[in-house]
Amino acid sequence: MKYISTILVCAGLWPAATVCAQNGGEKDSTLNRTVVVENQYNPEVMDAFKVNVMPEVEEPAAPKQAINYATDLRPLGAWKATPMEAMSRELAQKGADRGYVRAAYGTLNNVDLKGSYLWDISSKDRLGIMASLYGLNGDIPHFMEGEEWKSRFYRTDVSLDYRHDFRKVALKLGGAFASQVFNYMPSMNEGVENWPTTQRYTLGEGYVGVVSRDKDLPIQFAFQTGLRSFSLRYDNYYMVYGSENIFHTEGFMAGNINEEQQVGVGLEMDNLIHDVSQQDYTLLQLNPYYTYQGESVKLRVGAHVDLQTAYGSGLKAAPDVKLEYTFADTYVAYLNVLGGTRLNDFRRLNDFSPYWTIAQQMHTSYTPLDAKIGLKASPVIGLGFELYGGYRITKNELFAVPGGFYTDKQNVFYTGILQDKGKVGYGGVSVSYAYRDWVDFSVNGTYYSWNVTEGNEGLLQLKPELKADFSVRAKVIKNCHALLNYNYERRQKKADLKRADAINNLSVGAEYELLNRINVFGRLNNLLNKAYATEAGYPVEGLHFMAGISCRF
C-alpha cells in the first residue's frame, strides 16, 4: 500500500488549511431532509428527527411503462469505515408485516443484529420500536505496508417513535440513543505523546411535534422541536472530552392556490451549545417556495435564506429552483439550481468519518450554486437510463486528511477534517434493466473534476475522479438469487502528489427465501483482497465473508 506517503504529505497541509477555514463559514445543497411517507414504516430510520416534517420534494423520475420491474431492492454496497453490511433485501416491509429481525455473523467477528416492530396500539395510536448492533473485532491492513492492526468497532442504536392521531392533527413523540465504541489505528512511532487509543461516542435525541392530517385544511403544516446531544468520552490530540447539544426545530406551512399551484415556506433552526472549546451559535434557515405541477411540466421556484448569529455570522441566500419537462410519455428533462447552508456539527463529522478530529471548530458550509441538468428515460419496458452533468461551488467544504496534524508526535492515527473552498464539475450516465424477478442489473459511471485553493491540492487525495459501479441480481432457481457487485473509484491527482490507491471492491453473494418471509443470505466481500482507504480515511477490511438470516412477521 503506497498510502503512508500520502498521509504524511496531507498531514503537512493542516496549517495552510486551517488558515483557509478562517475565511468565513457557509453550506451545501438544500435543507437536508429525509422524507418518510406518513403511513409507511421504515425500520432502517435510526434518527428520531427523520420523520415526515418537511413537505415532500420529489426527484425527477421517468414514467414507468409497466409493472414488469423486479420487486426487490438491489443489494447494498459495502460499508466504508464501519464493518461489513449484511446483504439482505428486507429493508422495506411487505404487506401487513409489522416486525422484522435480522442476525448475521462473519469473519473478523463481523456482527449485524437488528429488530424492529410497529405496534398499532389502537386505531389512533402507533408505536415504532427498533434496536440494532453492528461491528467488528479483527485484524485489518495498516497504513504501514505489510502491517496489520487489531480494529474494534461496535455501534448500538435504540429508538422509539409514537404517534397519536387527533381529528385534524397528529401528535408525535420520539427519541433515539446510540453508543459507538472503537479504537484508533496505532501510529507505530516510538517515543511519541501518549493519547487515548480508544473512544466512545454517545448520541441521544428526543422530539415532540405536531402535523396536520386533514387534507381539506386550507393550510397544511408540521412543526417539530427537540434536543440532540453528541458526547465524546475521551480526549484526543486536539479536543478534550465533552459534548455538543443542539436544540433543533423544523417545520413548514403550505397552501394550495389551485389544483396545480402551491406556495409554502420551510423552516429549520439549530441552536448549538458546547461544553468543549467550541463557540455557541444559532443557524436559522428559511425556504419560501412556489410550485406548479401541470400535465407535462413541474416547476419549483424558491430560495434559501439563512441567518447565522456567530462564528461566520451574517445573512446568506441561495436559489431553490427545479424544473422538469416530460415528453414522449417516458422522457423527463430536468434542471436543478440549488444551494443553501449546511450545519457541520459533531454528528455530521461522525457521518463523514468515525475517526474524525478537528484542529479548530468547523464553520458551516455554504453553497451559493449547485446546478444539475439531466435526462431520464424509460424507452422500453424495464429499461431505464439517465444522462446528467452538474457544477457545484461550496465555501468551507469538508475534506478528510488521514493522519492529521503532527503525525510524528501521535501514538494513533486520526482522520483530520479540514475546510476549503471547493469547486466540482461532474458528468455521468447510468443504465438499469429489470425483468420481473429474474434479472435486475444497473451500471453507472461519473467523472469529477475538483478544484481547491492553490497550495491545498492535497485535500483532494481522497476525492473521486472517476466512479464506476455495477450490480446484478439474477434468479438461479425458484426463490434463490445470485448477486454480484463491483465498485471502482479512481482518486484525484493534483500537482506532484501521488494518486491515492483506488477503491476496487468486488463482492458476490446469494440469498434464498423461505415461506415468503424468511431470507437466508451470504456474501464474500473484497473478493480481490485489495488494500485502500475510503473517504473516511481508514483502510478497509481484506477478503471477508458474512452470512445470516432475517425474518418478517
Model segments located where?
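Outer-membrane beta-barrel transmembrane domain signature of Gram-negative proteins
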Residues: 201-211, 222-295
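Surface-exposed extracellular loop regions of Gram-negative outer-membrane beta-barrel proteins
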Residues: 121-141, 258, 262-272, 277-308, ...
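Exposed, low-structure sequence patches enriched in small/polar residues
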Residues: 96, 101, 298, 306-308, ...
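N-terminal periplasmic/intermembrane-space "pro-region" immediately following the signal or transit peptide
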Residues: 21-91
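Membrane-embedded beta-strands of outer-membrane beta-barrel proteins
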Residues: 115, 158-160, 206-210, 247-251, ...
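Outer-membrane beta-barrel translocator/receptor signature
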Residues: 80-84, 92-101, 105-143, 151-158
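Bacterial Sec-dependent N-terminal signal peptides
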Residues: 1-24, 331, 543, 549-553
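Flexible loop and strand-edge segments within Gram-negative outer membrane beta-barrel domains
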Residues: 136-157, 161, 171-218, 228-246
